[in-house]
Amino acid sequence: MYDHAHSLARALKESQEYKSFQAAREKIKGKPAAEQMIADFHKRQMELQAEVLQGKELTQEQKEGLERLYNVLIQDLDIRDYLMAEQRLGTLLSDVYKIIGEAVDVDLPFTK
């Protein structure tokens, strides 16, 4: 079983999604302002996700605020590339989790 898991890990590291993410991350490293903006964006996303998980409905103002922040961030091409690569890698990993969850018929919250 562990050999298969290691094979999957190697395949993920060889995927275009992972390679693109690594390349985009390298462009961001050493740019403190870009790193901070991305961290602030992620923090705001997580705060809003936490509210949703608590059963609260986001206001239009909250949604628009996050969208405005995102639109400011993507003006920097390196940040835009990073966020897009991060999203593609996240989708790939989510798909893999879903496939595994369905294969073993376990209802895990992150496979939905």
From Swiss-Prot:
Gene3D superfamilies under this entry?
YheA/YmcA-like (1.20.1500.10)
Q: Which residues form a coiled coil?
A: none
Q: Which domain of life is it from?
A: Bacteria
Classification via InterPro entries: Com_YlbF, YheA/YmcA-like_dom_sf
Which family does the entry's similarity section mention? Belongs to the UPF0342 family.
Q: What is this protein called?
A: UPF0342 protein STH1710
Q: Which organism is it from?
A: Symbiobacterium thermophilum (strain DSM 24528 / JCM 14929 / IAM 14863 / T)
